[in-house]
């Protein structure tokens, strides 16, 4: 099938025609994947000089409008337009539907086929007479996961990658599960994307049945069970969702190349890579773990670069996240590059074309958006002005980082001074029928049930599970709050965050959660102040000794646990407070622990747990923050060189 694509969106240089030819590319098991190859109009394979290729593998439709290609002030672009842009610059462009999606054959099992299928696709590209055999990959979210999955198998032809907001380092700890709990974005994504499955697209009655499902109502009836879920009409999607949900221990299921780069770092493709994410994205930990590991593989021949913004998942040109505005500087355009297309074009020029391959650039290794420093007032769009600025570094964490302990003290105090009391503790009752509602955070794919971002931590009718609109979460009896006095000077927190607790419970299993908050003082616009969530995490206590061999708790026995919220970068201004909220649920971000020892995916007998956090000298529960001297921060150099990439 041949189409001609005309580009009317970008500059005149990309307006030349490009031809699009669809191929059904066979994989090693005989399943064929629908693959569009975009070449210059009139290109003669085998006669004209071959071209380097850019590959994106996606489950979202290779010919559909691409959410990942939104530029400021413009609607999302069609993938044909994106292809024409790169074709005009001397590349072949390949878009492919993932297995079981849209025009491709086979059954869709989320993530698990992407390694072998990516390998086979890259091998096919290298064998085509229009190809130089040099391939760069790109893509957002799932299309970043597909890149990392293929790279784990060290495929032929792979020369460089641009991974935006994805690429699992260890999906058991970020992206599917976290701290032993299940991330329920997998459930919302499955239901929403099942509507685009081949079975649903080919059956109007099936489509009507799936469209009729009220997902918010289904979330109020959790846990689901196989055959008793909104996915019961689309069994291949229900099957893979419950595989993820019920595989609670870290075993061989979680060690496959599509979801576990950690197990392949030593043998994976060593190629130049850009890793990009953002503080309210669901893949902060994956991005940071991948950066830490890949930076060491071959830093000279295969450098790895890090870009961390303030935005939600993939919203690189949106200056706000939730109810908080970070200012126009938060956009990638004009800060990191002229625009995202130009950034990638320069990147692929640098690594895929012989004339420019290997040319040295002076890019910072890490470009980080430091949130904070704004007025704290409400802007014209109704968002709190938190502000921020880009900084740069040659490493992560930053060189001058001082990892500082803040101890949880009696009376709700968070202090650098260790406790003096020997037996201090605080207890609360956790009722799984009344979980703490999720109010923002590092979330994606949650519509129509939940949303990510930065919000004042008070209940609001916008958020699923709200029972008392307008009331601060801190007023709940099952949340324990610790905060510093107002800061006497600005404090920059940039890096990984760790919460170490000594706990006990009268239940055989329970969860503990931790949320780091910047408490902005009261002002005219926010007379009650603004408690802005920065990052949070969770720990399922049956894994206190091992992720692979769970053990129930003994009632009353004290255990040490570690919660690892995602890394962050925030300037706490003078007069602000640092706050840590401890609780035992965060729903619907995570599934709710029934406290009974049952699997949360299948529980039938939930119970109330009395949970205790210890604060004394023998069990000094504490928060560890990465503090960087404000005067040691290096501002990102202004973008003046049009060839800066």
Question: Whereabouts are the PLM-identified features?
Answer:
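Accessory cap/linker subdomain of secreted extracellular hydrolases
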Residues: 76-82, 88, 152-267
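Glycine/threonine-rich phosphate-binding loop and adjacent beta-strand/alpha-helix elements that clamp
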Residues: 3-8, 19-24, 325-343, 352-645
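Active-site-adjacent alpha-helix of alpha/beta-hydrolase-fold enzymes
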Residues: 78, 285-304
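Short beta-strand/loop motif that positions the catalytic acidic residue
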Residues: 275-277
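A catalytic-pocket lid/entrance helix-loop region that shapes and gates access to the active site
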Residues: 138-213, 279-280, 298-346
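Short, proline-enriched alpha-helix->beta-strand connector loops that line the catalytic pocket
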Residues: 267-273, 302, 401
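A short loop-to-beta-strand scaffold at the N-terminal edge of the catalytic core in hydrolase folds
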Residues: 29-45
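Cap/lid segment of the alpha/beta-hydrolase catalytic domain
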Residues: 44-127, 168, 174-177, 182, ...
């Amino acid at each position: 099938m041949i189409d001609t694509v005309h580009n009317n969106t970008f500059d005149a240089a990309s307006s030349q025609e490009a031809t699009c030819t669809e191929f059904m590319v066979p994989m090693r098991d005989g399943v064929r994947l629908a693959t569009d190859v975009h070449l210059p109009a009139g290109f003669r394979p085998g006669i004209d000089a071959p071209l380097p290729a850019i590959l994106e593998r996606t489950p979202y439709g290779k010919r559909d409008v691409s959410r990942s290609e939104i530029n400021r002030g413009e609607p999302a672009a069609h993938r044909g337009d994106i292809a024409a842009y790169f074709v005009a610059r001397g590349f072949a462009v390949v878009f492919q539907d993932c297995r079981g999606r849209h025009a491709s054959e086979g059954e869709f099992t989320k993530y698990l086929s992407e390694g072998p299928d990516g390998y086979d696709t890259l091998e096919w590209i290298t064998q085509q007479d229009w190809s130089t055999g040099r391939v760069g990959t790109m893509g957002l979210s799932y299309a970043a996961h597909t890149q990392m999955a293929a790279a784990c198998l060290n495929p032929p032809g792979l020369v460089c990658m641009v991974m935006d907001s994805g690429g699992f380092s260890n999906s058991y700890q970020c992206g599917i599960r976290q701290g032993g709990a299940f991330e329920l974005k997998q459930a919302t994504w499955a239901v929403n994307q099942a509507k685009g499955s081949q079975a649903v697209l080919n059956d109007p009655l099936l489509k009507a049945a799936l469209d009729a499902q009220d997902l918010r109502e289904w979330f109020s009836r959790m846990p689901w069970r196989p055959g008793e879920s909104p996915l019961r009409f689309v069994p291949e999607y229900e099957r893979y969702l419950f595989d993820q949900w019920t595989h609670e221990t870290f075993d061989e299921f979680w060690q496959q190349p599509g979801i576990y780069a950690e197990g392949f770092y030593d043998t994976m493709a060593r190629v130049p890579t850009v890793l990009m994410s953002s503080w309210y994205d669901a893949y902060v930990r994956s991005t940071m773990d991948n950066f830490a590991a890949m930076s060491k593989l071959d830093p000279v021949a295969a450098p790895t670069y890090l870009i961390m913004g303030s935005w939600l998942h993939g919203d690189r040109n949106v200056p706000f996240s939730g109810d908080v505005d970070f200012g126009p500087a938060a956009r990638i355009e004009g800060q990191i590059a002229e625009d995202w297309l130009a950034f990638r074009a320069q990147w692929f020029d640098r690594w895929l074309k012989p004339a420019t391959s290997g040319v040295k650039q002076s890019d910072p290794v890490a470009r980080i958006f430091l949130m904070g420093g704004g007025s704290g007032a409400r802007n014209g769009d109704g968002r709190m002005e938190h502000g921020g600025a880009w900084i740069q570094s040659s490493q992560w964490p930053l060189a001058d980082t001082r990892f500082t302990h803040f101890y949880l003290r009696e009376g709700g105090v968070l202090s650098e001074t260790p406790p003096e009391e020997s037996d201090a503790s605080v207890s609360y009752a956790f009722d799984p029928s009344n979980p703490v509602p999720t109010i923002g955070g590092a979330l994606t794919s949650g519509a129509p049930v939940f949303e990510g971002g930065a919000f004042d931590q008070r209940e609001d009718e916008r958020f699923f599970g709200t029972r008392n609109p307008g009331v601060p979460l801190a007023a709940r009896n099952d949340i324990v709050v610790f905060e510093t006095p107002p800061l006497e000077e600005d404090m920059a927190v940039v890096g990984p965050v760790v919460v170490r607790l000594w706990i006990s419970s009268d239940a055989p299993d329970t969860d503990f959660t931790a949320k780091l908050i910047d408490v902005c003082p009261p002002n005219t616009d926010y007379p009650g102040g603004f408690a802005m969530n920065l990052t949070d995490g969770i720990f399922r206590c049956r894994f206190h000794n091992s992720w692979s061999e769970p053990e129930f708790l003994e009632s009353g026995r004290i255990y040490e646990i570690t919660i690892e919220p995602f890394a962050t970068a925030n300037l706490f201004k003078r007069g602000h407070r640092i706050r840590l909220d401890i609780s035992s649920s965060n729903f619907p971000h995570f599934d709710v622990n029934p406290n009974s020892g049952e699997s949360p995916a299948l529980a039938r007998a939930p119970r109330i747990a009395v949970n205790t956090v210890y604060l004394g000298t023998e069990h000094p529960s504490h928060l560890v923050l990465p503090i960087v001297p404000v005067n040691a921060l290096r501002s990102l150099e202004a973008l003046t060189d049009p060839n800066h990439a």
